[in-house]
Amino acid sequence: MQLHELMDPDYSDNPFPLYRKLHQQGPLIPAGDKIIISGSHAVVDALLNDRRVGKNYMESVRVRFGDDAAGLPLFQGISRMFLVLNPPDHNRL
């Protein structure tokens, strides 16, 4: 499984073949440097509810678009959005 498969137009048209592939490859699938994908609802639910797990949005921008991209206004703005914040900032609402 590669991260770019999620960006493929075929995925948008019919995601089910990729979903099958995710389930066949197991609960945690490496998809790039420091990127793990899961097609398991139970695994994703457990991770989202585990306070030890966080996300690093800007690191994912650097990996995907290069070091300079993290300084672009677009990514700086997104990095302050509620959905990409970790606790305690995410919990303030």
From Swiss-Prot:
Entry-linked Gene3D superfamilies: Cytochrome P450
Residues spanning the membrane: none
InterPro entries reported in the protein's UniProt record: Cyt_P450_sf
Signal sequence bounds: none
GO terms assigned for molecular function: heme binding; iron ion binding; monooxygenase activity; oxidoreductase activity, acting on paired donors, with incorporation or reduction of molecular oxygen
Protein name, as recorded: Uncharacterized protein in aroQ 3'region
